[in-house]
Amino acid sequence: MAVGSAPQQDCLSHPRIVGVVLVHNEDVFVERAVRNAAPFCDHILLMDHGSTDATVPILKRLAKELPSAEFHRLSHPRESHELIAGLAGQDVWAFAVDGDEIYDTAGLLRLRERINAGEFARTWMILGSVLNVTALAADRRSASGHLAPPCRSMTKLYNFAAIDSWGGDAPERLHGGEVVFRAGFTNSDRRMLHDEAPWEESDFRCLHTCFLPRSSRESGNAATRENIMEKYGNSWQRIIRSARRLVGLPVTNWKDSRYRRGPEVTVSTTAFFSTEP
């Protein structure tokens, strides 16, 4: 079942924001990730692919508690993109949230005001500030990690009014496939908000807990956990990684290369954990 069109709206209406959560074994942070993102969204899809920890019960409970949420259990991650592909061409922003991405809700609400005011009407994609977390205080009042910039920003907020379609082979939502842009838009139409304001003043900022355990069933080094694109994306890259492992050659840790750039810093996280779930 795909997300349908919005009801008929008048010219004074604002864009819809559709949250797109796709997770697998993320029961440590997923509730906080969803609750922080939900006030920003008009509608939020909670999608699970094969979780064996407590993720599914958490998402089902949130789908009942949050009026804008609905739960989907997927047989393959590609279904997450199929659910939203029909939104192309509509006045909709698609906001992808992973189970290890905790946003500043107050900042998101300020960003929503800017979107409603039309500031980003000619923008295809918005990139925000990120702290790639290597340590989180026990009281969750502070965290240490590496900031974007200089790290790569991994936030995913797309203006579907800029495209006619997003089809082709998309292994998961908002990844891969073939994007067909409307006249006047290109893939380069991006706003790098992480370059426009420091972390403390950013309206679009995220704690990315990629170096922390994200599942109660997780063991070993969280930094080596494969993401969906590694499992289902470029087949040649998967073959090369497997071959290197078989012959005992090292495999590049992409998380370190993307998310451990620059100095390690410590920041306050009170804005991200202002209330208990």
Enumerate the language-model features and the residues they cover.
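Catalytic phosphate/metal-binding cores of nucleic-acid and nucleotide-processing enzymes, i.e., regions
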Residues: 24-25, 52, 74-78, 101, ...
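Conserved donor nucleotide-binding strand/loop of the catalytic core
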Residues: 60-81
